[in-house]
């Protein structure tokens, strides 16, 4: 640790000038070697010993991360590096590779400017490699490539130097294929990786060595030399000594990752919504430490001693202890109590943190991931702040959680709330009437690890078997449906119809929201969403969570503005619990076509109008060919070629479909789609049994799909039974009134 302590003060000095800073992340498919690579960088920085690098997992500071050997949360570290006489302060973010934790990856990408994408040379480019690279490109983060586990090609697969070179060239080609597919035109060509310009390195994180073209030329090393060294020494100790991996990686970073000033000049265009205020926009684009304070929050963590620790990037201005700030999303004024930089699990206090740095802040107790923090003095100039962080996964698996001791219930709810604050892909629903607590996550492992956190708090509870989250939608357009309020003095007429894919995509991607002015909103919906002009002009409410619209198509209705908020709340209630099975509604347009509102406010309050709206929408949806949508995973199985038949057979048995098979030397990759419902419970055991444990697979959320008719009624009744609802499917007529 001595060597490390010496550079702390110097690092802090370097961080005062953004030109010295490089903000980077290491991203990859699960088990391709990110954390082992990070440990090598820590070793070079003097944080851990060389011998421990590769096995210490220093950035995995969760106990369960150490046990499972996977990274769950994103941890931060700052490194000192010198190249050609120039000094760098390199802020490194380690991110998870397991698909269930991509929410943490997405948030990490917001604060970094370059990403080292790690690819296992045996497995090559996999489903998660594609996911994280696409996410990086969407956030305008420059990708670099490290091809890992070359030792396995030599020792296990016994490939010749020529075969290894062919494999590396194929990985580079496939990786550049991702940049071609997902990169923006202005970055596509210049961000493609090339061996010639040192934007690609290969090596072995486990054995601590790495090579770029320049290092190979400088040290006169050829492929055949590496093979010879492994033949003499299976641990490749000479390679660790002569070509340490940290030099290859940090050389790549120093050469190709932009400093925050350069990066923000093109990233802020994509990340910042409010472009009208030129002074703010320019301060952000220029990464101006003297500009107004603007910070983007990417993570919230609960520290057992310090409480809520907010991590984010200072895009403009300087963070100072004691300063009053305003949280744009939470609409709250708060005071910064302490400012620090991260060193793995430790925070090193810095009284001032200028633009371009990643900071840890105490005092922002109302912040959540995606929050925009600004100096209190400029709060009225910021309309909506940073673009919403878009997550590629959705919470599609749910469990019911019940405290064994009723006295523990408040503590259980509080602990789960804190977890959801830290993890945006985790959703808790507490039914006040029944006392039931539901926890939704992206997969079984995600929920298992989240509940492990709760057990660590000393709470005992029972957990149900995992079930799938469904969505309700409609396939047709209803006739106009009338519903009266309970006192019969108010009338609501509505229709229901499906939204087109373009509009759903606009809502999902955050390109339309209620914070936009009505003229801009209508223009985007009409031009990009191909929406009817009158509908686009009259959107009352956007359900950003489930992608639905409430549209006012009434003409000349008296007192409508006075009850608008009540009608809106009724709409949002139904969108959370649809008519078929009380599941969230997705992709539906509800049009209010007429209304009769009583003149006396006492007769038109929420107790009268909310049930009327709910009843009308239920009737309309049930008469518009209602459907249940089920979540579908994309599945990718890595298997020996002789087991392809078994893998295809199992996927087919589970209502899945295979869409492609790719040969990669001695392994084959089977790609397909499979309903999430079919992967719960025994799927892992069945796959292991049919392939004798020789197949490896990963799933990621892909899309929603209507349940087959043969299954829909059965599943709807199952859900209704589980929720204690009436065990028969509702009929539209039950919710329709007549004049």
Swiss-Prot record:
Q: Which GO terms describe its biological process?
A: translational elongation
- What one GO molecular function would you report for this record? translation elongation factor activity
Q: Which GO terms describe its cellular component?
A: cytosol; ribonucleoprotein complex
Which Pfam families does this entry report, sorted A to Z?
Answer: EFG_C (PF00679), EFG_III (PF14492), EFG_IV (PF03764), GTP_EFTU (PF00009), GTP_EFTU_D2 (PF03144)
Provide the primary localization: cytoplasm
Q: Which SUPFAM superfamilies match?
A: EF-G C-terminal domain-like, P-loop containing nucleoside triphosphate hydrolases, Ribosomal protein S5 domain 2-like, Translation proteins
Q: Is GTP-binding given among the entry's keywords?
A: yes
Q: Which UniProt keywords apply?
A: Cytoplasm, Elongation factor, GTP-binding, Nucleotide-binding, Protein biosynthesis
Against InterPro entries, the record matches this protein to: EFG_II, EFG_III/V, EFG_V-like, EFTu-like_2, G_TR_CS, P-loop_NTPase, Ribosomal_Su5_D2-typ_SF, Ribsml_uS5_D2-typ_fold_subgr
Cross-referenced SMART domains, in alphabetical order? EFG_C (SM00838), EFG_IV (SM00889)
Q: According to the lineage, what is the superkingdom?
A: Archaea
Gene3D superfamilies attached here? 3.30.230.10, 3.30.70.240, Elongation Factor G (Translational Gtpase), domain 3, P-loop containing nucleotide triphosphate hydrolases, Translation factors
Q: Where in the cell is it found?
A: Cytoplasm
Q: Which residues carry this modification: Diphthamide?
A: 603
Which residues take part in binding GTP? 28-35, 94-98, 148-151
User: Locate the tr-type G domain: which residues?
Assistant: 19-261
Q: Which family does it belong to?
A: Belongs to the TRAFAC class translation factor GTPase superfamily. Classic translation factor GTPase family. EF-G/EF-2 subfamily.
Q: What does this protein do?
A: Catalyzes the GTP-dependent ribosomal translocation step during translation elongation. During this step, the ribosome changes from the pre-translocational (PRE) to the post-translocational (POST) state as the newly formed A-site-bound peptidyl-tRNA and P-site-bound deacylated tRNA move to the P and E sites, respectively. Catalyzes the coordinated movement of the two tRNA molecules, the mRNA and conformational changes in the ribosome.
Q: Enumerate the PANTHER family for this protein.
A: ELONGATION FACTOR-LIKE GTPASE 1, TRANSLATION ELONGATION FACTOR-RELATED
Q: Which HAMAP family match?
A: EF_G_EF_2_A
**Name of the protein:** Elongation factor 2
Taxonomy, top ranks, is: Archaea, Thermoproteota, Candidatus Korarchaeia, Candidatus Korarchaeales, Candidatus Korarchaeaceae
């Amino acid at each position: 640790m001595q060597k490390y302590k010496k550079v702390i003060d110097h690092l802090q000095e370097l961080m005062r000038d953004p030109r010295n800073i490089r903000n980077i992340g290491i991203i990859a498919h699960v088990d391709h070697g990110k954390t082992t690579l990070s440990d090598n960088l820590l070793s070079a920085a003097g944080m851990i010993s060389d011998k421990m690098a590769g096995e210490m997992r220093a950035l995995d500071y969760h106990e369960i991360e150490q046990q499972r050997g996977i990274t769950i949360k994103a941890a931060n570290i700052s490194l000192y590096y010198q190249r050609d006489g120039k000094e760098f302060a390199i802020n490194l973010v380690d991110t998870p590779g397991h698909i269930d934790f991509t929410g943490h990856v997405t948030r990490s990408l917001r604060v970094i400017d370059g990403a080292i994408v790690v690819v296992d040379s045996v497995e090559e480019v996999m489903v998660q490699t594609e996911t994280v690279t696409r996410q990086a490109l969407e956030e305008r983060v420059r990708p670099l490539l490290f091809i890992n586990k070359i030792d396995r090609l030599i020792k296990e697969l016994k490939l010749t130097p020529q075969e290894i070179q062919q494999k590396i060239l194929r990985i580079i080609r496939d990786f550049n294929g991702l940049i071609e597919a997902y990169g923006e035109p202005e970055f596509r060509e210049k961000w493609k990786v090339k061996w010639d310009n040192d934007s690609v390195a290969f090596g072995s994180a486990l054995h601590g060595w790495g090579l770029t073209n320049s290092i190979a030329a400088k040290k006169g090393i050829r492929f055949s030399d590496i093979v010879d060294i492994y033949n003499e020494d299976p641990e490749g100790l000479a390679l660790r000594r002569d070509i340490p991996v940290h030099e290859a990686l940090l050389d790549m970073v120093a050469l190709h990752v932009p400093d925050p000033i350069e990066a923000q000049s093109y990233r802020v265009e994509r990340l910042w919504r409010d472009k009208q205020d030129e002074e703010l926009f320019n301060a952000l684009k220029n990464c101006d430490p003297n500009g107004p304070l603007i910070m983007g929050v990417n993570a919230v963590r609960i520290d057992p001693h310090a409480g809520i620790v907010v991590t984010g990037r200072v895009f403009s201005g300087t963070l100072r202890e004691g300063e009053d700030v305003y949280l744009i999303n939470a609409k709250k004024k708060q005071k910064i109590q302490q400012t620090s930089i991260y060193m793995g699990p430790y925070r090193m206090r810095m009284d001032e943190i200028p633009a371009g740095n990643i900071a840890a802040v105490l005092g922002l107790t109302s912040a959540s991931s995606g929050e925009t923090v600004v100096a209190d003095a400029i709060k009225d100039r910021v309309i909506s702040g940073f673009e919403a962080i878009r997550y590629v996964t959705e919470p599609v698996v749910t469990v019911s959680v019940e405290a064994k001791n009723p006295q523990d219930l408040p503590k259980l709810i509080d602990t789960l709330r804190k977890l959801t604050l830290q993890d945006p892909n985790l959703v808790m629903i507490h039914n006040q009437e029944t006392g039931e607590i539901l926890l939704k996550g992206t997969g079984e492992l995600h929920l298992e690890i989240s509940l492990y956190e709760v057990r660590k708090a000393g709470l005992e509870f029972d957990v149900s078997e995992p079930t799938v989250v469904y969505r309700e939608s409609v396939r047709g357009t209803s006739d106009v449906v009338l519903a009266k309020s309970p006192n019969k003095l108010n009338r609501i007429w509505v229709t229901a119809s499906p939204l087109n894919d373009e509009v759903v995509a606009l809502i999902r991607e955050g390109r339309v929201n209620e914070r936009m002015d009505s003229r801009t909103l209508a223009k985007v919906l009409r031009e990009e969403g191909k929406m009817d002009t009158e509908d686009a002009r009259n959107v009352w409410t956007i359900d950003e969570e489930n992608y639905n619209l409430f549209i006012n198509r009434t003409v000349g209705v008296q007192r409508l503005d006075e009850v608008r908020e009540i009608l809106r709340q009724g709409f949002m209630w139904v969108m959370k619990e649809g008519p078929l099975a009380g599941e969230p509604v997705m992709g539906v347009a509800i049009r209010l076509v007429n209304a009769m509102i009583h003149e006396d406010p006492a007769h038109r309050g929420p107790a009268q109008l909310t049930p009327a709206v709910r009843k009308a929408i239920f009737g309309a949806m049930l008469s518009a060919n209602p459907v249940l949508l089920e979540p579908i995973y994309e599945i990718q199985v890595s298997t020996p070629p002789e087991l392809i038949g078994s893998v295809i057979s199992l996927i087919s048995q589970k209502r899945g479909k295979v869409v492609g098979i790719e040969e990669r030397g001695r392994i084959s990759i089977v790609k397909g789609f499979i309903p999430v419902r079919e992967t719960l419970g025994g799927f892992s055991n069945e796959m292991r049994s049919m392939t004798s444990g020789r197949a490896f697979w990963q799933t990621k959320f892909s899309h929603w799909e209507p349940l087959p008719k043969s299954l829909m009624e059965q599943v709807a009744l199952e859900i209704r039974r589980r929720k204690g609802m009436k065990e028969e499917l509702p009929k539209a007529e039950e919710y329709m009134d007549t004049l």
